[in-house]
């Protein structure tokens, strides 16, 4: 019995020793695997609908540069949709590392949710504005010539524009309409009357600029599509020769920001690569891709190179001219604000 007990004891000790060695070996393998994983990172880019074409060109170039510079591989998950919808998705838990949205107020909402640190604008060149554009009029009939915003109402045209509750592009359209009155000397009351008349002739409110384009082009609705100039240029490059014009008397500067989502990059361990990607977007190489996709580049050298494809606007006003995003949001787009009052009258 004593021999048997000793035998069992020796066997148990051997098992424990082997188990301990296996455990040590397992930990070492995990550590090595973790090291390999750290060399392969993933970024989630959340952007608004009409930027897809540009980012599909830019991202592979950044991936190549990052590999050459660091020896590390980075892959991207990409999400595109209406800027307002994308903003809500990030606030509600979509773990974006980088957001590139249609307007600064959307980034500010993510900041207010505690996901982006204050003063994010100072973290990238050009106050974090990565592209610019203006509003364009796309007309169904070639003989319909439009030079000014006022003609939309004067000619009683059916207008297609997206819903500013979900689409950043639609907010720019709304502000372009409003500012065309107030920036030319009109009163807020006159601006509201003008905008009301336009929206009386808006048959449907798609959720984003891309869907608005589909309503106009594919479904054949409307006389005029209000759209980003960059979308119109891109469509022309793809062979869609729909006539369009840019109102050059007054127009709004559509300034689109980009930002790192601080809480998510810290959680994912991707801050370094996320910040590098944001900075890459301001390089001439990336800015040329934005220009090729119809955006007005913020790099001055690239802007001069592509100047011929953009009409000069005589009076280019900004959101700041309308009081800034906080005032604009409260006055126009909050629940019960001017936009809701206008659509309630339809």
Enumerate the predicted regions with their spans.
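Extracellular/periplasmic juxtamembrane helices and adjacent flexible linkers that interface
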Residues: 2, 28, 265-346
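Bacterial N-terminal signal peptides that target proteins for export
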Residues: 2-11
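C-terminal motif of bacterial Sec signal peptides marking the signal peptidase cleavage site
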Residues: 19-23
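N-terminal segment of the mature folded domain
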Residues: 28-166
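Short beta-strand->loop
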Residues: 46-48, 139-141, 157-184, 198-202, ...
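Periplasmic-binding protein-like
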Residues: 129-136, 195-199, 206-207, 238-271
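Short helix-loop capping/hinge motifs at secondary-structure junctions, enriched
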Residues: 142-148, 166, 179-187, 264-272
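Ligand-binding pocket segment of bilobal, Venus flytrap-like solute-binding proteins
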Residues: 184-249
């Amino acid at each position: 019995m004593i021999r048997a007990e000793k035998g069992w004891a020796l066997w148990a000790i051997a098992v424990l020793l082997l188990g301990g060695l296996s455990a040590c070996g397992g930990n070492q393998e995990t550590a090595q695997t973790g090291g390999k994983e750290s060399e392969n990172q993933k970024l989630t880019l959340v952007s608004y609908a009409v930027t897809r074409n540009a980012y599909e060109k830019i991202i592979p170039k950044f991936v190549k540069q990052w590999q050459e510079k660091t020896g590390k591989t980075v892959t991207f998950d990409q999400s595109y949709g209406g800027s307002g919808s994308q903003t809500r998705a990030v606030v509600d838990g979509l773990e974006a590392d980088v957001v590139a949205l249609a307007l600064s107020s959307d980034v500010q909402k993510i900041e207010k949710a505690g996901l982006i640190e204050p003063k994010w604008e100072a973290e990238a060149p050009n106050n974090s504005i990565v592209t610019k554009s203006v509003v364009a009029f796309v007309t169904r009939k070639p003989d319909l010539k439009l030079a000014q915003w006022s003609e939309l109402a004067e000619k009683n045209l059916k207008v297609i524009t997206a819903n500013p509750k979900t689409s950043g592009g639609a907010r720019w359209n709304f502000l372009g309409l409003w500012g065309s009155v107030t920036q030319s000397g009109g009163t807020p009351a006159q601006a509201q009357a003008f905008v009301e008349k336009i929206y009386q002739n808006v048959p449907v409110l798609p959720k984003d600029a891309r869907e608005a384009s589909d309503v106009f082009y594919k479904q054949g609705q409307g006389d005029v599509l209000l759209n980003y100039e960059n979308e119109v240029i891109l469509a022309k490059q793809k062979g869609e020769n729909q006539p369009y014009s840019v109102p050059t008397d007054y127009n709004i500067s559509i300034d689109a920001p980009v930002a790192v989502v601080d809480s998510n990059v810290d959680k994912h361990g991707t801050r370094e690569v996320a910040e590098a990607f944001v900075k890459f977007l301001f390089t001439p190489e990336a800015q040329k891709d934005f220009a090729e996709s119809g955006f007005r580049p913020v790099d001055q050298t690239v802007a001069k190179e592509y100047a011929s494809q953009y009409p000069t606007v005589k009076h280019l006003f900004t959101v700041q001219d309308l009081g800034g995003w906080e005032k604009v949001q409260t006055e126009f787009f909050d629940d019960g604000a001017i936009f809701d009052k206008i659509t309630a009258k339809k």
